[in-house]
């Protein structure tokens, strides 16, 4: 069974609150290396939207509280064996509260529920469902955090198994760090596989998942 590589992003706000996506992130996120892109809204501009659409032929999005257009407020997407629910997150109170989000997750009858709005990356399990927040890929400011770290999530879905890679740009070193979480559909918890001390190994592993993007190509794109 072939793995499905899924990008999860939220709250870009480019150019309103951030000038662009960090070049190191763009060097990894190359068109036609991803099978699916899931956007949680507040993209910011047509150019940013077009960039996201260029990354994969299978794009799904929901509307954020600053978005216009006809995207849905919530959505259910099937990828492999997983039902994935999507919502921006401004619709529930308290904002970002998993207990509040769980009602919508039950309504959608999903295995994985992704939401944004808080600009803070996170993973949690409740009622045998995996809740994911990718944070803000541009590090755009919010009412929750004045200066959040840019972040996004890559999911590798194979059968009933999900590997979650959390990418966060370290503000001090200006290098991205990678954490890895493993989850099996319907389980009560997830497994933290590594911490940021092993980020180099994780970078190599996810690059392999993305069809072995050459390191020289990534470096060249990061310099442009």
Language-model-detected regions and their locations in the chain:
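N-terminal active-site segment of His-dependent metallophosphoesterases
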Residues: 1-58, 67-73, 151, 184-191, ...
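Beta-strand-turn-beta hairpins that frame and shape the catalytic cleft
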Residues: 1-7, 76-85, 125-131, 157-163
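Short active-site segment of divalent metal-dependent hydrolases/proteases
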Residues: 14, 45, 91, 120, ...
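Short, well-ordered secondary-structure micro-motifs
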Residues: 19, 49-50, 72-74, 96-98, ...
